[in-house]
C-alpha cells in the first residue's frame, strides 16, 4: 500500500530527533531513519498490527522501542497519524487531535 505521513507525525518524528540530539546527535539521525523504515514496513502489511478501535475507525498501532506508531488503514493508503512515546496518554492525544477545529475554507 502507499504510505502517507500526516503533518503531525512529521512533527512527532522531528521532536523525537531533537530530543535525542540533545545527548547524541548521531543517534538522533539514525533513530529517526529507523522510525521512517518502520513506517515503510507497516505499509507493506498493515493488517498484522493491533487494531485500536478506542482511537478511531481503521486505526492500528505498532510499538517500536519505547515509541508507538499509530496509523490508519485506508483503501489505498496507510497513513501514519502519530509517533508517540509509550508513556504518553495516547487516547487523550487522539481526542485532542479529533477535537481540533478545521481550518477555514479559502475564499
Which sequence ranges carry the predicted segments?
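Short proline/glycine- and basic residue-enriched helix-capping loop/turn segments at helix->loop/beta transitions
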Residues: 41-44
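Arg/Lys-rich, positively charged N-terminal/basic patches that mediate binding to nucleic acids
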Residues: 1-32
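Enriched for short, Lys/Arg-rich terminal
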Residues: 67, 72-107
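Short, hydrophobic secondary-structure boundary micro-motifs
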Residues: 29-30, 50-52, 92
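Basic/aromatic recognition patch in beta-strand/loop cores that engages polyanionic ligands
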Residues: 37, 47-78
Amino acid at each position: 500500500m502507499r504510505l502517507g505521513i500526516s503533518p503531525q507525525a512529521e512533527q512527532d518524528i522531528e521532536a523525537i530527533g531533537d530530543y535525542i540530539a540533545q545527548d547524541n546527535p548521531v543517534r538522533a539521525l539514525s533513530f529517526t531513519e529507523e522510525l521512517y523504515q518502520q513506517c515503510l514496513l507497516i505499509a507493506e502489511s498493515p493488517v498484522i498490527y493491533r487494531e485500536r478501535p478506542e482511537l478511531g475507525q481503521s486505526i492500528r498501532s505498532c510499538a517500536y522501542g519505547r515509541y508507538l506508531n499509530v496509523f490508519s488503514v485506508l483503501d489505498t493508503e496507510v497513513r501514519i497519524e502519530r509517533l508517540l512515546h509509550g508513556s504518553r496518554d495516547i487516547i487523550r492525544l487522539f481526542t485532542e487531535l479529533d477535537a481540533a477545529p478545521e481550518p477555514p475554507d479559502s475564499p
